[in-house]
Amino acid sequence: MSDTFWAFVGLVLFLALLVYFQIPQKIIHHLDARAKRIKDELDEALRLREEAQEILAEYQRKHAEAEKDAQEIIAAAKHEVESVIAEARTKAEEYVKNRNKLAEQKIAQAEADAIRMVSSSAIDLAISTARVLIAKELDSNRADELVKEALSKESLSKMKTHLN
């Protein structure tokens, strides 16, 4: 009996002991459990991946909505600014028109005042000149009568209408 024979017998006995103690079934059971655990982990990873993709899609949709809302807000703000500018421009033009109208009224009033002053001065000068001429040419009684007549309201209103 050779060494090879005894090595073969030892191998057969070892394998028989393994079968007797059900080691191959235990190894198979352990490998099956590990394969099941790995399969469960892969299923969980796929489920988590799908959930992550759903969340990503939802956030991308929300981001797109937020962009759209931001663009709408910007457009509304631009429209509001344009409205405010147009209103301010209209008010400024109206203010300038009112100021010009007021200035024209003040100028017209100043012209009227100047005309009245010149008319009044001209009347006073005419009266003074008439008084001096009358005093030289007429006696004092007749001069006073003519001055009183000239200063009457009727004659003053006639003079004003002629001067205007």
UniProtKB/Swiss-Prot annotation:
Pfam families linked: ATP-synt_B
Gene Ontology terms, MF aspect: proton-transporting ATP synthase activity, rotational mechanism; proton-transporting ATPase activity, rotational mechanism
Domain of life according to the entry: Bacteria
UniProt-listed InterPro entries: ATP_synth_b/b'su_bac/chlpt (IPR002146), ATP_synthase_B_chain (IPR050059)
Residues spanning the membrane: 4-24
Transmembrane helix as UniProt keyword: yes
Subcellular localization(s) per the UniProt record: Cell inner membrane
Keywords annotated in UniProt: ATP synthesis, Cell inner membrane, Cell membrane, CF(0), Hydrogen ion transport, Ion transport, Membrane, Transmembrane, Transmembrane helix, Transport
HAMAP family (UniProt xref): ATP_synth_b_bprime
Cross-referenced PANTHER family: ATP SYNTHASE SUBUNIT B, ATP SYNTHASE SUBUNIT B', CHLOROPLASTIC
Function of the protein: F(1)F(0) ATP synthase produces ATP from ADP in the presence of a proton or sodium gradient. F-type ATPases consist of two structural domains, F(1) containing the extramembraneous catalytic core and F(0) containing the membrane proton channel, linked together by a central stalk and a peripheral stalk. During catalysis, ATP synthesis in the catalytic domain of F(1) is coupled via a rotary mechanism of the central stalk subunits to proton translocation. Component of the F(0) channel, it forms part of the peripheral stalk, linking F(1) to F(0).
Subunit structure: F-type ATPases have 2 components, F(1) - the catalytic core - and F(0) - the membrane proton channel. F(1) has five subunits: alpha(3), beta(3), gamma(1), delta(1), epsilon(1). F(0) has three main subunits: a(1), b(2) and c(10-14). The alpha and beta chains form an alternating ring which encloses part of the gamma chain. F(1) is attached to F(0) by a central stalk formed by the gamma and epsilon chains, while a peripheral stalk is formed by the delta and b chains.
Designated name of the protein: ATP synthase subunit b 2
Gene: atpF2
